[in-house]
Structure formats: structure tokens, C-alpha cells
Amino acid sequence: MDSNIAIEARHASKIYELRSKEKKSDVKFYALKDLNFEIKKGQVVGILGTNGSGKSTMSIILAGICDPDEGEIIVNGTQALIAINTGLNAQLTGLENIELKGALLGLSKKRIEEIKEGVINFAEIGDFLYQPVKKYSSGMKSRLGFSINLCLDPDIMIVDEALSVGDKGFAEKCLNKMTELKEQGKTIIFI
């Protein structure tokens, strides 16, 4: 793969087995079928489609959460998925979620402490930081998830409808940060 390419899809498909109405056999459903594309480092790309067209399936494949069933997706760099209600444990507090995400990604306790203040400042959720995430509004969850992933400094940011919730002020703050990331040569994918 060319070193200027952030993501390359080669005949990638994601297939789900659906039980037929008669429950006698499974039917193959292609959520994604034979995708071929390249996204260059530093590009900002928007992926559009109707409900059920496979956009969120693509986002979890691009993020490395699951693999395509056919073909391959090659990712050149670290990636972070920012999606509504994704990656947060509802039983834990916001602060505990910051620590958990860092630990799951293999960050040292020192590195987690270094990024914690940046997450807290960017998220602007005040005392809710010490409450279980299950008490958060969808906008607050989006703020926390976005802020955690932002402070991890990934090469590739995959934003799956995460900016569609919450207030206009925070969305503008996020878009300004995305502009900064683009200027740093980061790859950004909006879904």
C-alpha cells in the first residue's frame, strides 16, 4: 500500500446471516458489498447514505472493531471511532470511562493522567463527570466520547453521527477542532 494512503478497501463485503420467514434456512444479507476505495492521509471524507445502507457497519470496520467477511480493509495509522453511545460503559462514571478507555488501549497510568485534564476541559460536563454515564443525556455522552477520542490523538478520526446530538456550541467547537486536526494532516471521515 502507498504510504500516502490512510485507508484502502479491496473488494470488502460484510455479510449477515438472516433467518428466513419460514425459519428453515438462513439468507445472506450484504450490509456492504464489494467496496473498493482509497482515502489519502490528510483527507476529509464524507460518507452519505440512507438508513440501513451500511454506513455504521462501515464505520465499525474502518475502526477495526470487526472485520469484513470478504476482501480486506487496510488501515495505515491509529484510528478512533466517535459514535453515539459507543465505547462508554453506562455503569461507570465519566471519569472512570476515561480511565477505562485509556487502559483498554494500553496506555500507562501516567499517560492516562496526562490526557485526563484535556478530556475534562473539552467535554465541559461539569459535575456529571462523577456520575454514572447512564444518567447522561445523549449530548453529554457524545461530548465525553468525542473528547476521549480526541485526546488520544489518533491518525484517523471516524465520526459516525456523533455531532448530530447536543448543542450547537459544542458542535462548532468540535468542527473547529476538526479543522485543526486536518491542518495537522489527520484523516477525518464523517458518516
Give each language-model segment a name:
Residues I7, Y30-L32:
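Conserved structural motif at the start of ABC-family nucleotide-binding domains
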Residues L48-T50:
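The feature captures the beta-strand-to-loop junction immediately N-terminal to the Walker
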Residues A63:
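Helix-to-loop junction immediately C-terminal to a conserved catalytic motif
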Residues D69-T78:
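ABC nucleotide-binding domain "signature motif"
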Residues E99, R111-F128, S147:
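Conserved ABC ATPase "signature" region
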